[in-house]
A protein has these predicted regions:
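Short Gly/Pro-enriched turn/cap motifs at secondary-structure boundaries
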Residues: 39, 160-163
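Hydrophobic/proline-rich hinge and linker segments of small-molecule sensing/allosteric domains
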Residues: 168-175
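Short, well-ordered beta-strand micro-motif
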Residues: 49-53, 150, 172
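A glycine-rich helix N-cap at a beta->alpha junction
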Residues: 138-161
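Conserved alpha-helical elements of sugar-nucleotide-dependent glycosyltransferases
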Residues: 25, 106, 165
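Active-site metal-coordination/substrate-binding segment of hydrolases
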Residues: 59-146, 172
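Short acidic loop-to-helix transition motifs that present clustered carboxylates
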Residues: 43-49, 129-131, 156
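Acidic/His- and Gly-rich active-site-bordering loop/insert found
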Residues: 1-89
């Protein structure tokens, strides 16, 4: 893990973004990805969609990398601390906010350092922690990638290639 990625992760978790209150973080991220050369916007729901051009590859199809911006509670006033063991923890009574700002930090670092890459579409949704509301409202017409990766796993060195579907049911009980 690079020092730059650790610094940026610590910077990101200090920007409050509990579910429903992600606007400040997403505005920061929008400026960040534009500064890295992306064409980027917020869709009508406030989800971030960014397109990064290919590097060293002109024929590859775009790949989607996806994360979410929101955190669970308590996620206001996070103070990250890097321990002597190299592990980043919250200094107080808050969560750390690694879910999913660690994924965002990984994507940003990969985009900065990859010597060759296909075009990348980067989608960062709002309100994942409260029922995937941002993804449900995302403007998919802004995306062209046919393949993608969700950067929201809790196990290092593991790739999840499938998972259960998110389903909601409305049940009416009579009697």
């Amino acid at each position: 893990m690079s020092e730059r990625m650790v610094r940026q992760f610590c910077q990101m978790v200090q920007i409050d973004s509990e579910s429903g209150n992600e606007a400040r973080f997403l505005a920061w991220l929008l400026d960040e990805v534009r500064g890295m050369g992306a064409e980027a916007t917020l869709d009508g729901y406030g989800n971030l969609i960014a397109r990064f051009p290919a590097v060293g590859s002109t024929t590859a199809e775009p790949i989607l990398l996806s994360c979410h911006a929101d955190t669970v509670k308590p996620g206001v006033g996070i103070e990250p601390v890097v321990g002597d063991d190299g592990i980043i923890r919250s200094a107080g009574d808050t969560i750390l906010g690694a879910d999913d700002k660690a994924g965002i930090a990984e994507v940003l670092e990969a985009l900065r350092t990859a010597p060759v890459r296909p075009p990348i579409e980067f989608a960062v949704s709002r309100q994942e922690e409260v029922g995937l509301l941002g993804v449900k409202a995302m403007d998919f017409s802004l995306l062209t990638a046919k393949r993608g990766f969700l950067m929201d796993n809790d196990t290092l060195e593991t790739i999840v290639v499938g998972g259960p579907t998110y389903v909601t049911l409305d049940v009416e009980v009579k009697g």
